[in-house]
Amino acid sequence: MALTNEEILNAVAEKTVLELVELISAFEEKFNVSAAAVAVAAPAGGAAAAAEEQSEFNVELTSFGANKVAVIKAVREATGLGLKEAKDLVEGAPQVLKEGVSKEEGEELKKKLEEAGATVTLK
């Protein structure tokens, strides 16, 4: 007997956050998909020229992905925060990790966090 959408929603509503994270990971594995947000194309023209002139960037953690522990370690290393503060920051994604950094520093931090499994944007 197939479950109705209502029954599925009720079952999901009863799960804890940790159980939901595990469920999402299982969906990603089974169907070979990613729950990461789709990047939106940047506007062309004048906005591109303004982006070239920008000298300071904000590093924003948009998602911690499947490997939250590795992302927390990378955030601690990059920011010098304690374990609890780094964990709260990661779990509260999207969050700005660093403000007013150079493009080089921002790209380096973005690379480290993405290697740990996070989704990061420079703004």
Swiss-Prot record:
Any one GO BP annotation for this protein: translation
PANTHER family: 39S RIBOSOMAL PROTEIN L12, LARGE RIBOSOMAL SUBUNIT PROTEIN BL12M
Assigned protein family: Belongs to the bacterial ribosomal protein bL12 family.
GO cellular component, one term: cytosolic large ribosomal subunit
Species whose genome carries this gene: Acinetobacter baumannii (strain ATCC 17978 / DSM 105126 / CIP 53.77 / LMG 1025 / NCDC KC755 / 5377)
SUBUNIT field: Homodimer. Part of the ribosomal stalk of the 50S ribosomal subunit. Forms a multimeric L10(L12)X complex, where L10 forms an elongated spine to which 2 to 4 L12 dimers bind in a sequential fashion. Binds GTP-bound translation factors.
InterPro entries listed in its UniProt record: Ribosomal_bL12, Ribosomal_bL12_C, Ribosomal_bL12_C/ClpS-like, Ribosomal_bL12_oligo, Ribosomal_bL12_oligo_N_sf
Function: Forms part of the ribosomal stalk which helps the ribosome interact with GTP-bound translation factors. Is thus essential for accurate translation.
Domain of life: Bacteria
The protein's name: Large ribosomal subunit protein bL12
GO MF annotation list: mRNA binding; structural constituent of ribosome
Record's keyword terms, sorted: Ribonucleoprotein, Ribosomal protein
